[in-house]
């Protein structure tokens, strides 16, 4: 472990000195004094999002015994024509949001179905966290239902869903029997969208480690982003990327480096489908490490300077 720690220190120094070209501003209007995290676009105009927050004004005033914070609910905001984010409001008060915690939203490609993690607040019985889904017609959401996966029941703790574009492959995070240690990323498949998902399988021993792999995000069906504290990096959870090779195997994960990653926890990345911009969450600039914030990232345009002599 001492050798690994030394390597991490060297990574931190090198990556801070030579950051990637992305800009990662913190979005003040979306963040609060509580934790704000887990963003998903909710329309193909890419000007409206939902995200999770433990801010005041949620469904319940109770505190989560595990985190000491309020339970998280879904909130929404819209970007106006000037590019500014408008007032943050609760997504709803009695359909998707509950007395428990809702988090890590994922919308299908038609923006009609929301998949998310739900951790109920049952006072008299034990329950785990499950993956739920709800469909939208106009501005109205259906009641959420549990996404059925073979061998998984209500006592299991699973979450952080991301799906293939045809919704036949479901990737999620869980600490399960036959895993590699800590929480791993798993994948489950089905034949059609009306079927139950099959028995989960561990994604890859190249991706998963004896540490924790969480917050998977599938982009264009062949690129998977996730966070890990088991691959080494800048500290805490770092964001990594792996791709499918020509044989359909996941490649060795690559650290996204600074400024995506920091000495804190960096996670929950989501991309615009065709542009190099999106969101992620981090506790990098917080005093107690509990106030996670939402960051926006964008690859700025490359500017060229031309010089020369004009002759007749």
Language-model features, listed with the residues they occupy:
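Short, conserved micro-motifs composed of acidic
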Residues: 1-309
């Amino acid at each position: 472990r001492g050798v690994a720690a030394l390597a991490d220190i060297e990574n931190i120094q090198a990556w801070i000195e030579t950051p990637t070209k992305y800009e990662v501003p913190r979005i003040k209007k979306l963040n609060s004094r509580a934790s704000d995290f887990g963003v998903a676009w909710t329309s193909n105009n890419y000007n409206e999002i939902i995200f999770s927050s433990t801010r005041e004004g949620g469904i319940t005033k109770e505190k989560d015994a595990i985190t000491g914070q309020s339970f998280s609910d879904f909130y929404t905001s819209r970007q106006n024509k000037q590019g500014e984010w408008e007032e943050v409001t609760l997504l709803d008060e009695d359909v998707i949001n509950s007395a428990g915690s809702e988090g890590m939203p994922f919308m299908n490609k038609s923006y009609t179905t929301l998949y998310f993690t739900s951790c109920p607040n049952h006072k008299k019985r034990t329950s785990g966290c499950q993956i739920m889904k709800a469909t939208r017609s106009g501005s109205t959401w259906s009641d959420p239902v549990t996404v059925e996966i073979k061998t998984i029941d209500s006592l299991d703790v699973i979450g952080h869903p991301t799906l293939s574009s045809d919704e036949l492959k479901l990737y999620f995070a869980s600490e399960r029997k036959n895993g590699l240690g800590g929480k791993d990323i798993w994948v489950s498949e089905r034949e059609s969208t009306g079927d139950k998902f099959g028995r989960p399988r561990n994604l890859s021993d190249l991706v998963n480690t004896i540490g924790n792999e969480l917050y998977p995000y599938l982009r264009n069906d062949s690129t998977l982003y996730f966070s890990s504290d088991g691959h080494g990096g800048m500290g805490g959870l770092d964001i990594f990327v792996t791709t499918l090779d020509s044989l359909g195997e996941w490649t060795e994960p690559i650290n996204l480096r600074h400024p995506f990653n920091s000495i804190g926890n960096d996670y929950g990345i989501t991309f615009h489908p065709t542009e190099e911009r999106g969101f992620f969450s981090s506790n990098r600039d917080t005093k107690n490490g509990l106030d996670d914030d939402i960051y926006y990232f964008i690859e700025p345009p490359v500017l060229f300077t031309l010089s020369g002599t004009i002759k007749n």
